[in-house]
């Protein structure tokens, strides 16, 4: 909040506002889940995203930050079958529009705004500190013969996820890899320094698009550090609302928050 705004409040209002900001930030940190498929659907005016975990059997109607881990397969540690996109009617019938998408090509595009390009944090310090990755390091998203490489200066580019038919459903996983050099889906050097890697994207289908969502990947760090990175994007990489909006948001999130899973 700009410093010139606070003097217009009484001391009580300032304390209330700061408290609201702290509460909202803490609550927003819970609106992000690791190891969830993205659940894209239409609310009639734009694409919205939730999350679903087959393993945990849980579904969230609203999620904007998703976490995944490299290294789950020791034989192929730098290639994973995430993120996934799944809006099955088995768990979305209570969503707006019954969880369906408009027919068309579901595409993922690099977010051109704040924290859209590939950022990195080495996991040290008292708080997360993300900055663009070193030149040459990229994350690659692959579907079939199509690839989307995202580096520290990438501000555009898109990848087709799936063709959405009249039923409005999708279940598709991308293959994600991390490395440097090469071209397309092949890196000269597969892998990169341990740490947390993240980028932002938007989704589009049938003429509608989403607000930015964020993908936060763990490479060789603890899940506690991964969670700190996820929470950073949940609280820092979104536009700062006014203090009164934060109060409303805090109450709303408190009413609907779910445990991280």
Predicted features and spans:
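C-terminal cell-surface anchoring/sorting signal
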Residues: 2-28, 242-261
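Mature extracellular "passenger" or substrate-interacting domains of secreted, surface-exposed proteins
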Residues: 34-237
């Amino acid at each position: 909040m700009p410093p010139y705004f606070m003097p217009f409040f009484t001391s009580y209002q300032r304390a209330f506002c700061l408290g609201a900001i702290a509460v909202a930030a803490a609550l927003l940190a819970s609106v992000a889940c690791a190891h969830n498929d993205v659940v894209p659907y239409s609310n009639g005016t734009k694409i919205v995203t939730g999350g679903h975990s087959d393993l945990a059997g849980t579904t969230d109607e609203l999620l904007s930050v998703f976490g995944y881990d490299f290294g789950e397969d020791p034989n192929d540690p730098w290639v994973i079958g995430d993120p996934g996109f799944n809006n099955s009617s088995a768990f979305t019938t209570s969503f707006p529009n019954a969880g369906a998408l408009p027919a068309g090509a579901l595409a993922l595009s690099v977010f051109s705004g704040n924290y859209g390009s590939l950022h990195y944090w080495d996991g040290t310090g008292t708080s997360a500190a993300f900055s663009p990755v070193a030149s040459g390091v990229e994350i690659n998203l692959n579907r079939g013969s199509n690839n989307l490489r995202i580096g520290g200066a990438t501000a555009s580019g898109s990848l087709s996820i799936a063709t959405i038919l009249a039923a409005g459903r999708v279940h598709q996983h991308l293959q994600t890899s991390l490395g440097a050099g090469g071209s397309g889906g092949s890196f000269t050097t597969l892998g990169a320094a341990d740490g947390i890697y993240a980028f932002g994207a938007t989704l589009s289908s049938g003429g509608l698009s989403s607000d930015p969502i964020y993908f936060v990947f763990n490479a060789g760090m603890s899940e506690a550090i991964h969670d700190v990175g996820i929470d950073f994007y949940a609280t820092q990489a979104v536009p700062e609302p006014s203090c009164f909006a934060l109060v409303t948001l805090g109450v709303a999130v408190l009413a609907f928050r779910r445990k991280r899973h």
